[in-house]
Amino acid sequence: MKQQYSTISLLLLTLLFLLSCGSKDPIDYWGQNKQKEEQENNKEIENKTDKPRYIWIDAAANFPDFANSKEAITRDLTLAKDAGFTDIVVDVRPTCGDVLFKTSMVEQVKYQYAWTSTGYTKIDRTAKWDYLQAFIDAARKLDLKVHAGINTFVGGNTMNNGTGMVYRDESKRAWTTQMSTAQGIVSIMDEAEPTKFLNPANPKVQTFLCNLLRDLAKYDLDGIVLDRGRYLDLRADFSDLSRKKFETYLGSKISNFPEDILPKGATKLSGKSSDYTKKWLEFRAKTIRDFMEKARNAVKSVNSKIQFGVYVGGWYSTYYTVGVNWGSPNFKTSDYYRWATKNYHSFGYADLMDQMLIGAYASPLLVYGNTEWTMQGFCLQAMSKIKGSCPKVVGGPDVGNWDTANKATQEQENQAIVQSVKACMDACNGYFLFDMIHLKKANQWKYAKEGIAKAIEKTNQ
């Protein structure tokens, strides 16, 4: 009888072993479809009432109110505080590349274009007071934390027939990115791209930006957030400088550039790739990580207490197109995405960050879920990829540009704001909303307030 029980036990153990060792799910070739991803045993994040709630304040969009009025700044920060936000991110370097803080590195912003009741309007800044300092002063009185946001690898835009340092200064114009187009490699200055990106691999660009960050870190800030700390897209950068740096990285010459890497003008990967394609993606990710390390050191050299961080889009599966690996170096990217080399994970930069703002920019009809292109899913996936390397990961929606097809009713959009707070806060370390202007224009403060109140109620249960 003992032998019979032993035999049965052995059979059961064998069956359980076989069931537990089912075949792996196939990996989507470029990882751009709805792939099953590692959840990394996402431990339930402890809910706390002190989870931060960030609201972004875009410079251009809010310029009609804030460019020349401290009273308007105080008024709207009071509304943010009343709604339950704990942190503000003040954009002080819009895409023109000029700034709204004190520095000798570049000129002050003189004007911005914004949508007003009379259309797309030029708003001049005539005030002489310090824009960033005005936000800091108002925020401190309200017990709000203040973070300065900058557009990083940009130097101008096409507004007003060209605005920014790359239009004023020929030496800076040489810093702009060289794009691969169907017609060949051309400067972004000769293309219709509205934002003029700089080449992240250019040492002069990196030095300039680090010096700019040192000046910014002199302010009484809680944090600094880098936006657009990336390449334009897959078409950039194909300058001679980038080619030489890539060849040095490879340890060999490329005879047919850029075709040996990507077809001319390619904006996405095709089913076939050359031996150099994935190595090029790795090189770009390394370039961005190396810069982020320099930028962090620049900030910390002035004030070690400032939280250094980034804004990134939550769509990690395609974020390689802009040269960024925002995951943890411990997240083995190539286990899930065929576009990644075995070494791609080494250039994840989450471990360099004190805080990360994740754009969970899904439709108002897609608040809940586990995958990308749902708000909750963006946050869950981000936590899975960051793997604790960054201590503060906050995510949330763009509440003004989330329904371009106009599929949601106004009430559905209102309720999506309410629902988004708890959905995102439960999935990560806090909440992030873009942008203040949208809440103001649609008079939606009350929905943000309701959502924050419900999320905090959950934490008190």
Regions found by a protein language model. Give the residues of each.
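Bacterial Sec-dependent N-terminal signal peptides
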Residues: 18-49
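Glycine-rich, aromatic-flanked loop segments that form ligand/cofactor-binding clefts
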Residues: 85-96, 130-189, 225-228, 304-309
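Substrate-binding cleft of secreted/luminal carbohydrate-active enzymes
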Residues: 343-461
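Catalytic domains of carbohydrate-active enzymes, especially glycoside hydrolases
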Residues: 72-98, 219-223, 346-358, 427-431
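Aromatic-lined carbohydrate-binding/catalytic grooves of carbohydrate-active enzymes
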Residues: 85-127
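Active-site-adjacent "subsite" loops/lids of carbohydrate-active enzymes
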Residues: 47-67, 148-219, 270-277
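Short, acidic/polar
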Residues: 65-81, 205-215, 332-349, 409-423
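Polysaccharide-binding and catalytic clefts of secreted carbohydrate-active enzymes
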Residues: 181-352, 359-361
